[in-house]
């Protein structure tokens, strides 16, 4: 399947790798199906690209690579919505807000993207924990190109 993207142009994706969101990402009601596109083999960043909207894409990263003590408990409701049965079938991403210079970019730790990897369901979860929506990326050496 081919999709048009603002960042990568027209690309081919494997439909089996798409992620269906069980609820909308706030502010993006028309985007329900996404795919993760790596920015490069050696970079810890992906584009969470909407299948429905070419211009809807988020730079995401694994928050545990940037804040090793990051931890939260998913509600039973979120687990049920996503069909989570085992922790090994869960991936977590944080949306990155890019700034110049790159070192001043931030991660949204308050609202992670949680993906159940077996059935490929996703949801942005708003945490009650005291995590910030703008956690400094700081010392990360990689750059998004």
From Swiss-Prot:
Family per similarity comment: Belongs to the FliW family.
GO cellular component, one term: cytoplasm
Record's subunit section: Interacts with translational regulator CsrA and flagellin(s).
Single GO BP term: bacterial-type flagellum assembly
Signal peptide (UniProt feature, chain positions): none
UniProt keyword terms in alphabetical order: Bacterial flagellum biogenesis, Chaperone, Cytoplasm, Translation regulation
Classification via InterPro entries: Flagellar_assembly_factor_FliW, Flagellar_assmbl_FliW_dom_sf
Protein name per the record: Flagellar assembly factor FliW
Disulfide pairings: none
Role description: Acts as an anti-CsrA protein, binds CsrA and prevents it from repressing translation of its target genes, one of which is flagellin. Binds to flagellin and participates in the assembly of the flagellum.
Subcellular location: Cytoplasm
Xref: HAMAP family: FliW (MF_01185)
